[in-house]
Amino acid sequence: MQILCIGDVVGSHGCDFLRRTLPAFKRTKGIDVVIANGENSSDGNGITPASANHLLDSGVDIITTGNHTDRRREFYDYIDESDCVIRPANFPPEAPGKGMTVLDLGRTQIAVINLMGNVYLDEHLACPFRTLDTLLKTPDLPKICIVDFHAEATGEKRAFGYYADGRVSAVFGTHTHVQTADETVLPKGTGYITDVGMTGPINSVLGVRAELVIKKQISKMPVRFDFADGPCKLDCILFDIDEKTGLTRSTERFSLR
């Protein structure tokens, strides 16, 4: 089973580049399932029904999110009703949407879990480690289970990877928009990367126009951030997963230009 996980898609330019790039890459690599973090896929921050549909129409099967999930109120009803878009499972139960979904491929099923870190991000959220424990007790949980861990701190992400090792198929980190070079199969068979990266404009600061970020750093005043344009990239990781064991055989990291 070939499962592709794509880094945070940034704005309309990221969405458009994904639409141009993903279909051919799926065919070339024989990819079965695509998971993408879409929490920044709308211009102006957050995710909207339109940007989510753009990603799904482009070949993404499941969209995960993060700390920007609730930025756009028009998205609340959409995520409540969708089985293809999830938000961090350790959000309060009153939050719209759900934190886990199951994709039925006919011959097999795949569970996708979304969690968010506490360190430097939101210390008031429920513990992602304990939330994982609860979710893994779900009756009839599929053998293949992928986790998007949306978190800031490398240490928290790596600790979570080892905590989940042998219990889920793969853990891919999101949020920082910077692809790390530590993709691996952990000792008990879980595929892992600290951060898969970003899908969006290359000449930018995490997708934002560089001059705006520089202005904020120098002036220490509020600055409205706009996404950059120009050439884009698609950062992703491919997990080769054994359908019998649910564990990862190999990982391969890409940055498509």
Residue locations for each model-derived region?
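Acidic, metal/ion-coordinating pockets
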Residues: M1-R257
